[in-house]
Amino acid sequence: MAESVLTHLVHQLHLDNQFEIDSAATSREEIGNPPHYGTKNKLYEENIPLVPHRARQMTRDDYLYFDYLIGMDSANIRNMTRIVGGTDSQDKIYKMLSFAGYEDTQKFTGARDVADPWYTGNFDETYEDVVAGCKGFLYYLQQKGDISKEIEIPQ
């Protein structure tokens, strides 16, 4: 869901050429699987195109290649840190909801986990969390000067 939401926001802002967005699993349970039907349905309901993909395992090379690695929950963060060798030496690993509200506070929050629809069945809540995190991430990049401050990020 997060890959599709962030891709959609970036496209709306005409920033496609400034981003490479990908997603990867931090555990092996879903390797090779497409997005869950609940995710597909929620994205369709919100008129957000699904980025077609099948789950792949995150690797240490991802850490070396990408500028940011964003996990949805504490377990993701632990797994990501383990995969990259036990330490986030380049300060690239973040929890999605640490960005939520960044536009108001200009600082990271003590973020809770994104609501996991695997347990809750509530794709609406997950979607709201993901949108808040993605928008906050874009505000963060804007404050850092990585994207223009003149670009208006949708509320």
Where are these regions (language model features)?
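Conserved active-site segments centered on acidic
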Residues: 1-66, 140-155
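Phosphate-binding/catalytic loops
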Residues: 68, 74, 78-155
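Short secondary-structure boundary segments
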Residues: 1, 73-74
